[in-house]
Amino acid sequence: MSQSFNRHRRLRTSKAMREMVKETRLHPSDFIYPIFVVEGLEGKKAVPSMPDVHHVSLDLLKDEVAELVKLGIQSVIVFGIPEEKDDCGTQAYHDHGIVQKAITEIKEHFPEMVVVADTCLCEYTDHGHCGLVKDGVILNDESLELLAQTAVSQAKAGADIIAPSNMMDGFVTVIREALDKEGFVNIPIMSYAVKYSSEFYGPFRDAANSTPQFGDRKTYQMDPANRMEALREAQSDVEEGADFLIVKPSLSYMDIMRDVKNEFTLPLVAYNVSGEYSMVKAAAQNGWIKEKEIVLEILTSMKRAGADLIITYHAKDAAKWLAE
């Protein structure tokens, strides 16, 4: 038989051999776990559209984070659901808002936990949009000041990282200036630089009670059909002072992740969003897929595509599986 071909299978002959030449590895420290803290809630409450994800009360937050620490997960991103909402999202930037209280609670008990604060208005506005609204139009420049106030209040509460997710033009510049003015020059910005207008966000909007009450978010979030626009968005945020770049969603946007990783040297964060999570959970519950294998394959693929960190609701399960 001719020996002119390459025998690639030599490096696949055993589990040990495959492990030796593995190019991409997952570790619990790669994961950022999202937590939904609800004002006025007693105990925990399941999110129906996101199996195994819960709303958590402030008094149970310590136990929730303690579990993450035991699993080796070193970072959380905090979302808050207030009791009261208004057209200006006042509770987003209130010094005693639910997210501010949650951040302080986590840092008091777990000072080494890296707390990322989601900086947006949609969970706090009665209309569900990420900025101020006038005559049905989401106002850009007028919303920036409120976002800056939100970021500063979160930093004062103890946030390690500010993560603005609103997709208003200029948000990184305004937030950076506000943080620096208040003395928070060492607080990094994890920018939702590339955030598409996606139907994969559906379960999250249930969890965060942030579904728009009119229209959609297509005037400020990106068109899923666009690729080059992602690089323009990322470039703007790099120039404005971002320290991390997020691509959201990620499972259907790995080409975008690779483009961004190839173009920029900042740490890249993949957001493995709620719809991606819930599809896997639903299929696994029906016995159509092997959940463990699918989840680890998806997360590995995101890292292979260029992600340095992954925001994922699978974090706890994945950390347990990686420890087996």
Curated annotation (Swiss-Prot):
Top-rank lineage group of the source organism: Bacteria
Q: Which cofactor does it need?
A: Zn(2+)
Tell me which residues bind Mg(2+). E233
Q: Which GO terms describe its molecular function?
A: porphobilinogen synthase activity; zinc ion binding
Per UniProt, the keywords (alphabetical) are: Heme biosynthesis, Lyase, Magnesium, Metal-binding, Porphyrin biosynthesis, Zinc
Q: Which enzyme class?
A: lyase
| Residue ranges that the Swiss-Prot or TrEMBL entry lists as coiled coil | none
Residues recorded as binding Zn(2+), renumbered to this chain, are C120, C122, C130
Question: Which family does this protein fall into?
Answer: Belongs to the ALAD family.
- Under which name does UniProt file this protein? Delta-aminolevulinic acid dehydratase
Q: What is its EC number?
A: 4.2.1.24
Q: How is the cofactor bound?
A: Binds 1 zinc ion per monomer.
Oligomer and partners: Homooctamer.
